[in-house]
Amino acid sequence: MSSKILLTNLRTSASFCKTLKFPQRPRTPFIASQQSCAIHVDNPPSIPTLTTSYVHGLSSHPLQSSTVDQCLQATVERYPDREAMVFVQDGIRKTFAEFYQDVEKAAAGLLAAGLKRGDRLGMWGPNIYEWVLMQFATAKAGIILVAVNPAYQLQEVEFALRKVQCNAVVCPTKFKSQHYCDMLKQLCPEMETASPGGIKSSRLPDLHTVIVTDSQQPGSFLLKDLMQAGSSQHYQQLQDLQKKLVCDDPINIQFTSGTTGKPKGATLSHHNIVNNAYFTGMRIGYNWRKNVRICLPVPLYHCFGSVGGGVIMALYGTTVIFPSTGYDGRANLRAIEKEKCTFVYGTPTMYIDMLGQPDLAKFDLSSVRGGIAAGSPCPPEVMRKILNVMGIKEMVIGYGTTENSPVTFCGFPVDSAERKIVTVGCISPHTEAKVVDPTTGEIVPLGAQGELMIRGYCVMLEYWQDEEKTRECITKDRWYKTGDIASLDQFAYCKIEGRIKDLIIRGGENIYPAEIEQFLHTHPKILEAQVVGVKDERMGEEVCACIRLKEGQECTVEEIKAYCKGKIAHYKVPRYILFVQDYPLTITGKIQKHKLRERTEKQLGL
């Protein structure tokens, strides 16, 4: 390529990025005291290095500047005949070569439908092949994929699509009780008379294209037809586009899980997610392991699934096994056994469900070497059972947030059981973390508790077109406020103590629910425990434990209180104990504590 053409391409890319008004990745200022707390994390740190609650993870491996499509293309060239993914329930198997052919057809089809670089396409549905297909087709076409929660109802999906000005939506006709096309027709009755790609909606003025994966609907494209619509002109357009796409382009809008308030659109770039997948995969050892087959039950709509599954697949050539379209604990175990999975992903709740299967011992899990538990705090007792009952010895905890692409701390497979049980792992490469006093903002002494803050390549570009919310969580010098109470040790391992907003203040005493939850998990009859603060006229708040018992077990309030007495401080002993069958969850498996609190107070008549 001539220098003149290269300069023209760079100017075009720079001009495009400027129109989006995204903050640039900042240069980290040199701070002498912080430089002394840098630590190499390509391997588990063996020398106690940190002297304060600040750490900068160093690596001999540089940050990657590739786009998602460049990563996938390189892997396709290396392993064309290797299985890329298996959708067990739907009977779909694709090699990398077959998958990439579909990606190119779908990307050209999107251009044929009138979509262009920088447009937003909402993917609304469960874990189906078309979700992964759209993830990579949009990346190749320079279109921003919007991950829409498959459980959203009418008002929620309208809010999401309007928030990010979606130009297109891809969805199945329905899934279980979710009638996606019917809801879209309620929002856009104009679909009934519109031509495909020509929707003009009063409620969703930016939406002009609906693509249905499995049936022909009025005003919509059928995906398989769209994949044949690309002409030689569109393929040439696609080829020319590859010269203009850069790693700083936004690629993905992930809505925060909405455990409180309205969801916000965390906007991530190629640079964010490629590097997060690259260094997370390296931490687990995907760069040297052979024949890695990952059981992936977590939803694709969440970063854990799309980055930890899809982008890692594109980088390392791993095979991803999707056990079922919707979450099913037994389907996970069947898929592990049938497909000889070597790694398994899941939220703590998913592992609890698998551990709770009465015939768990009948499943052959001998192929599994390791896995990741992430998405919400993993109680120590649950981790012990994963290690000892399921026998997953190379299990690690991953910690992060959607806004951080998502992983910022992750364990090493060779870590001791104690580290796996007590911490969320070690700082990720090229990432800074500090623990500060939430009131003063000053870094706390090593080992002390405070709010965890993160800075580095992983921090999102912004909440989509929401400067106010972005400023609330990202400081002027690009530190992201996690809202988590944490502490660091000398080796750069992190312990999460709880959420600031979940803190219970009982008569002036600060109580972290996670501490009580971890203790309750040691009771032999308890499957899962969640603790919330409920209002109390005298104390301000009181502690309430909502407990799920193991199958076939019976227990009383008095038995639980007697178990607590003398083992935890008297003010931490729950005043109220409720035995429940389930908890309000987000689609990603996170407990919605605010809804649990509301439900509990109503049940108690408070």
Swiss-Prot record:
PROSITE patterns: AMP_BINDING. Its EC number is 6.2.1.2. GO terms for molecular function: ATP binding; medium-chain fatty acid-CoA ligase activity. It catalyses: a medium-chain fatty acid + ATP + CoA = a medium-chain fatty acyl-CoA + AMP + diphosphate; octanoate + ATP + CoA = octanoyl-CoA + AMP + diphosphate. Its main location: mitochondrion. It is an enzyme of class 6 (ligase). Residues 1-13 form a transit peptide. One of its GO terms (cellular component) is mitochondrion. GO terms for biological process: fatty acid metabolic process. Keywords: ATP-binding, Fatty acid metabolism, Ligase, Lipid metabolism, Mitochondrion, Nucleotide-binding, Transit peptide. It is found in: Mitochondrion. SUPFAM superfamilies: Acetyl-CoA synthetase-like. It comes from the Eukaryota. ATP binds at residues 256-264, 484, 499, 590. Belongs to the ATP-dependent AMP-binding enzyme family. Acyl-CoA synthases catalyze the initial reaction in fatty acid metabolism, by forming a thioester with CoA. Has some preference toward medium-chain substrates. Plays a role in adipocyte differentiation. PANTHER family: ACYL-COA SYNTHETASE (PTHR43201), MEDIUM-CHAIN ACYL-COA LIGASE ACSF2, MITOCHONDRIAL (PTHR43201:SF5). This is Medium-chain acyl-CoA ligase ACSF2, mitochondrial.
